[in-house]
């Protein structure tokens, strides 16, 4: 048993955002893709065998939570306190009688994990009065929110200010944000600061955050420093967690579910140059690798059950790869770039063997999980065109003018399209770039007419087909994808790189 460091994990919160999303488990028990949230916390503290876990005495899942604690750390000390909504520092205060006042102490929130050196943390813990584990630079969860704790330091790297739920500047990536791991030279120092925090009501929205416990310490002249961690995994909201699970499944090489043979055509558009990624890579976009697979192969998995499968390409390297590794996909190659996405689709369709079957036209830069192409085909019974869309794509919400959007009614019929202009409707869906047409004839006709009518003053996208079909009173419906990712912008490239580096470092799937 390690008696040199105290680890305290408050777990008394309700996790209301998860409850609202329909999660039935209490937050520490929610699965993340690499185990429960609590397991993700404890993996960072391998040397601490007897953490102090604070739980609510009245939570209906208390028994299950206690079982999970003991499963992970048989020698853990479980402290039950009355339910409250006063934040983690208040929970620690309620458990103060269980703390050794002279031991170095770590308070760790229960809804995140990361990668850092435990040995370095333990060494640094006793070299100053307080130690905040922080992260800096690009982090994907910042696309959704900036509501985290941030620190400000002087020229000697001493923390001078701590602020909850907001950065100090307009560029949070250049600041150090708190991960949720808080160290104190002794529990005595910590509890003294918490007492002042409670007495002076140093809180945010009536919650006593442990980040704010350092404010009395700083005022009293105690030394607080930070330790930057290598990677940070945020699970504090359902969207953050679901992003992490999405990437964990890619890392684990999970594929889309198998589906029965689909009597349709599948066409992947992979002739683009990917110029928007020029600052990050000179690799043609379809040849970018994500967890060991070429980007377009994720789309190839989707159309694997289609009767006829084709890919429209322009690169000799791509053609050789397709022939060698995907012999069942017909390659349709050209020697130069097309002028637009719509023109690529038109040329690709013209090069395919004519038939009366439906056709799925897929972008080569989408990664879509847990979708059966047969489910999309089924919707063609009541539609002439199906547009693949999603609702919770963080980068689209952050840069709405970079995406096209549609309004969808209660019957999943598309009623309006907003082309690269954002949407005034918060309930709108962003377009993924995949389209399913009732027949090849319909696809060739509407795409050809959109190009000839030049409805766009710039590049003609397949997105423009939606407006054309609506004006012609064709039935246009939405196929809603719950989780997807695209690599078409610098932000998306950075996100993909971050997660690949993270899971490689985790070593969970190697």
Predicted regions and their residues:
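Conserved N-terminal catalytic core of the sugar/cofactor nucleotidyltransferase
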Residues: 1-10, 17-19, 31, 35-107, ...
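Conserved alpha/beta core of the MobA/IspD/sugar-nucleotide pyrophosphorylase nucleotidyltransferase superfamily
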Residues: 2-7, 101, 175-266, 428-510
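Active-site glycine-centered loops adjacent to acidic/histidine catalytic or metal-binding residues
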Residues: 13, 111, 136, 237, ...
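Short alpha-helical oligomerization interface
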Residues: 23-28, 282-286
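A structural signal for short hydrophobic beta-strand segments in well-ordered beta-sheet cores
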Residues: 29, 151-153, 226, 287, ...
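Alpha-helical elements of Rossmann-like donor-binding domains used by nucleotide-donor carbohydrate transfer enzymes
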Residues: 93-94, 120, 213, 243, ...
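Conserved core of the sugar-phosphate nucleotidyltransferase
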Residues: 114-201, 369-453
């Amino acid at each position: 048993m390690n008696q040199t460091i105290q680890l305290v994990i408050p777990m008394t919160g309700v996790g209301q955002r998860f409850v609202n999303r329909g999660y039935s488990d209490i937050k520490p028990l929610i699965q993340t893709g690499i185990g429960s949230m609590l397991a993700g916390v404890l993996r960072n503290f391998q040397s601490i065998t007897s953490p102090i876990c604070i739980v609510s005495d009245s939570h209906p899942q208390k028994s299950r939570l206690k079982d999970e604690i003991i499963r992970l750390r048989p020698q853990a000390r479980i402290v039950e306190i009355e339910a409250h909504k006063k934040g983690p520092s208040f929970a620690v205060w309620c458990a103060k009688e269980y703390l050794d006042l002279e031991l170095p102490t770590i308070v760790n929130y229960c809804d995140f994990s990361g990668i850092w050196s435990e040995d370095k943390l333990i060494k640094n813990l006793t070299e100053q009065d307080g130690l905040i584990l922080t992260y800096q630079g690009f982090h994907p969860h910042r696309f959704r929110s900036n509501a985290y704790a941030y620190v400000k330091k002087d020229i000697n790297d001493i923390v001078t200010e701590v602020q909850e739920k907001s950065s100090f500047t307009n560029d949070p990536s250049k600041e150090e944000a708190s991960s949720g791991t808080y160290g104190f030279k002794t529990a005595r120092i910590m509890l003294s600061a918490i007492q002042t925090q409670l007495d002076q009501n140093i809180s945010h929205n009536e919650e006593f955050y442990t980040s704010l416990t350092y404010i009395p310490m700083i005022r009293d002249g105690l030394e607080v420093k930070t330790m930057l961690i290598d990677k940070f995994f945020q699970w504090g909201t359902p969207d953050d967690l679901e992003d992490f699970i999405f990437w964990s499944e890619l890392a684990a090489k999970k594929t889309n579910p198998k589906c029965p043979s689909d009597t349709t055509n599948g066409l992947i558009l992979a002739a683009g140059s990917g110029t928007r990624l020029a600052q990050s890579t000179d690799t043609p976009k379809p040849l970018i690798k994500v967890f060991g697979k070429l980007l377009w192969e994720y789309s190839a998995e989707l159309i694997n059950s289609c009767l006829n499968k084709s890919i429209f390409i322009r690169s000799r390297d791509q053609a050789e790869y397709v022939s060698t590794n995907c012999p069942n996909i017909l390659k349709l190659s050209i020697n130069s770039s097309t002028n637009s996405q719509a023109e690529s689709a038109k040329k690709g369709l013209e090069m395919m063997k004519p038939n009366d079957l439906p056709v799925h036209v897929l972008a080569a830069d989408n990664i879509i999980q847990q979708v059966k192409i047969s489910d999309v085909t089924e919707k063609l019974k009541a539609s002439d065109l199906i547009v693949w869309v999603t609702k919770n794509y963080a980068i689209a919400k952050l840069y709405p003018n970079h995406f096209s959007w549609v309004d969808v009614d209660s019957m999943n019929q598309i009623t309006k399209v907003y082309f690269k202009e954002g949407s005034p409707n918060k309930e709108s869906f962003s377009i993924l770039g995949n389209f399913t047409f009732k027949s090849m004839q319909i696809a060739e006709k509407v795409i050809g007419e959109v190009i000839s009518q030049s409805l766009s003053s710039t590049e003609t996208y397949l997105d423009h087909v939606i407006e054309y079909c609506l004006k012609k009173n064709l039935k246009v419906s939405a196929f809603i994808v719950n989780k997807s990712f695209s690599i078409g912008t610098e932000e998306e490239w950075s996100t993909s790189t971050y997660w690949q580096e993270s899971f490689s470092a985790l070593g969970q799937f190697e």
